[in-house]
Every structure is written in structure tokens, then in C-alpha cells.
Amino acid sequence: MTIMRKNHPLLKIINNSFIDLPTPCNISSWWNFGSLLGICLMVQIITGLFLAMHYTSDTATAFSSVAHICRDVNYGWLIRYMHANGASMFFICLFIHVGRGIYYGSYMLSETWNIGIALFLTTMATAFVGYVLPWGQMSFWGATVITNLLSAIPYIGSTLVEWIWGGFSVDKATLTRFFAFHFILPFIITAFVLVHLLFLHETGSNNPSGLNSDSDKIPFHPYYTIKDILGILMLLMVLMILVLFFPDVLGDPDNYTPANPLNTPAHIKPEWYSSLAYAILRSIPNKLGGVTALILSILILAMFPLINSSKLLGLVYRPITQAMYWIFIANLFILTWIGGQPVEYPFTMIGLISSILYFSIIVMFMFIASMIENNILKSH
């Protein structure tokens, strides 16, 4: 009798995706982050659902409702901090996942890569509208500053900003619609994830060697399910250490002050995972130029399949491009740090240099490095 999981219409899909999936036998722990992102998404949806049961999206009561969740709801403090710090864990896994894709040349699976970029943008949008919901000082001013950027769009900018605000300033209508967006976007992300997996399983996973692994594959279960469970346990351990011992270490103290439109904070500081894009935005003195640079800082990831001119896939056997890659990663850390600093010298200058370097490495230096490596290969 044939096993039910191979015949049943629904179980067959699960079987082909998570059990009998042919997987390269040499993929390392860097490939764990896809499953960790799936767990992060589940944690965020479950904790978010419980928070939504007690949260009120009204400017008069939003801040109080978050305080009520932490004080009066059973384990409300745990759910709230798991959701807030879960977002940080989500982005840590996301950045590593993208970084691994760049290092090992996974961007050559272009459909999977492009859906991944759409996922990245949607996740950043979800995090932004979610950050506004507690209605603290940084929530309010962050919403005001970031939505105001749309006014840089010629002709329709001002109308577009007022349309998003639902009035002439960030107010009750803005908070209500941001709550609606924050509720629906994770389900759109889930749909994107399924498409991401669909495209990935069409081609099969990449592997660290960059070679075709069709001749040497093993079933996903039990080998990689066990490996993923270890990763998940480590992720949850780090998350719970953050939640139980350092719940506010990644947050902003200003967000414990209720939103006040008459009092501007010393400087607008986004969450750490948005600092990178925010630093690039701030480094351009022109408003429209800044917004364009902000959008391009994410969309430039789509250029990787186009500018790849190397005869080798991935950076394992490419020392010059490898050096460029690690300079690029160091530069990302600098940009993340700069995004949280005041707008004054020397931070503005460091931000400008780092922003130029960010785009130059991707568009120019990596391309030049791969051409040099190709010539070295030819000469041997």
C-alpha cells in the first residue's frame, strides 16, 4: 500500500516541500535562515493576533491600551515584548538570509530572488506601520517624517501625503489605517513566502560549492528537519533571553512618552533595522534625491543577477570579490550606526561616504573584481 503522504492531494504538496524534497547534501548552517524566517513569521502572526485583541487604534487610547496589555492582560507583557523583539530577530535572520544569497550566488535563481526582494520591501513596510501603533513620541514623529517623504514626488506629492494621512496631519485616521495595514500585510507576506518556496522548489536549492548538485541529493527529512529544529531552538533561546532580560535594549526610550505633536524629539531615530535605509536617505541633501536613494538602496538588490559576470558561482573561490563583499558588510554596519546618530558633523560626512560606497561596491567594484578574476582564470 502506497504511503498516504505521497497520494493525498494536500499531503502530497507538504511531502514534496518538506519531507521528500531532494536537497544538496552539502548545504551549511547559512541555509537554516529560511526556516528561521518562517518561524519568526509564525511567532509574529500569533503574538500579533493576541495583541490585536486588546489594542485600540484610537489616538486617545492607543498608548494606554499598550500599557493595559503590559499591566493587566495575562502574560500581556510577554506577548508584547515577544512581538517587539521578534521583529528584531526577524530582521536579523532576513539580513543574514540576503547576505548568504549574495555570498553564494543564490541571486542567479532570479524568480526566487525577485520575490525575495518583494518580501523584503513588504516586511519593511509592515515593520514601519507597526512601529507607529504604540503611539509614543518616536512612533508619531517617525510616521510624520517618513510619510512626509512622499511629498517629494513631483505634482502629486502633497495630495498623496494628505491621502495617506486621511487629513492634514498624522492623526486618528492615520493610526486606524496603519493598524489595518499592519494586520493585513503579514498575510500578504505569507502568500509571498509560498510563491518564494514554489519558485525555489522549481529549480532546487543552491549549495556552498556553486556546482550543480543534481547527482548528489538527499531527502530533506530527517537530515535537514533535525538541523532546522536545532536552529529554531537556538533562535527561540536568543529571543527569550532578549524578552526576559533585555526587553527594551533595541527600543527607543522616547516611545514611553505619549505622542505629542507640539514637542519634537531631539532627533528622529528609527528602529535599528530601518537605520541603514534612513542613513542613506539623510545623506542626500535633496529631498527627492534622498527618497530615490532610499528606494534604490533596496531595489539595487535586483541588479545582482544582471551585473554578475564571473565564470564562478558564489564567492567561495573568488578572493578579490570576497574582500569587496566583507567591505560591503562592514559598510552596512557603519550605515546602521549612522542612522541612529544626530544630523551633525562628522556623522553627516560619514553617512555620505558610506552611502556612496554602498552603491559603488554593488554597481562598480564587484563587477571590476569579477572581471579581474576572470582574466586570472583565463591566464591559467
From Swiss-Prot:
Superkingdom in the source lineage: Eukaryota
Binding sites annotated in the UniProt record for a ubiquinone: 201
GO terms for cellular component: mitochondrial inner membrane; respiratory chain complex III
Membrane topology reported for the UniProt record: Multi-pass membrane protein
Keyword hit for Mitochondrion: yes
Cross-referenced InterPro entries: Cyt_b/b6_C (IPR005798), Cyt_b/b6_C_sf (IPR036150), Cyt_b/b6_N (IPR005797), Cytb/b6-like_sf (IPR027387), Cytochrome_b (IPR030689), Cytochrome_b_C_euk/bac (IPR048260), Cytochrome_b_N_euk/bac (IPR048259), Di-haem_cyt_TM (IPR016174)
Binding site for heme b b562: 83, 182
Residues annotated as binding heme b b566: 97, 196
Keywords recorded for this protein, A-Z: Electron transport, Heme, Iron, Membrane, Metal-binding, Mitochondrion, Mitochondrion inner membrane, Respiratory chain, Transmembrane, Transmembrane helix, Transport, Ubiquinone
Localisation per UniProt entry: Mitochondrion inner membrane
One MF term in the entry's GO annotations: metal ion binding
Cofactor(s) for this UniProt protein: heme b
A GO biological process held by the record: mitochondrial electron transport, ubiquinol to cytochrome c
Cofactor details (free text): Binds 2 heme b groups non-covalently.
Disulfide bridge map: none
Pfam families: Cytochrom_B_C, Cytochrome_B
Residue ranges of the TM segments: 33-53, 77-98, 113-133, 178-198, 226-246, 288-308, 320-340, 347-367
Quaternary structure, from the entry: The cytochrome bc1 complex contains 11 subunits: 3 respiratory subunits (MT-CYB, CYC1 and UQCRFS1), 2 core proteins (UQCRC1 and UQCRC2) and 6 low-molecular weight proteins (UQCRH/QCR6, UQCRB/QCR7, UQCRQ/QCR8, UQCR10/QCR9, UQCR11/QCR10 and a cleavage product of UQCRFS1). This cytochrome bc1 complex then forms a dimer.
Note: Heme 1 (or BL or b562) is low-potential and absorbs at about 562 nm, and heme 2 (or BH or b566) is high-potential and absorbs at about 566 nm.
Role: Component of the ubiquinol-cytochrome c reductase complex (complex III or cytochrome b-c1 complex) that is part of the mitochondrial respiratory chain. The b-c1 complex mediates electron transfer from ubiquinol to cytochrome c. Contributes to the generation of a proton gradient across the mitochondrial membrane that is then used for ATP synthesis.
Family: Belongs to the cytochrome b family.
Protein name, per record: Cytochrome b
Gene name tied to this protein: MT-CYB
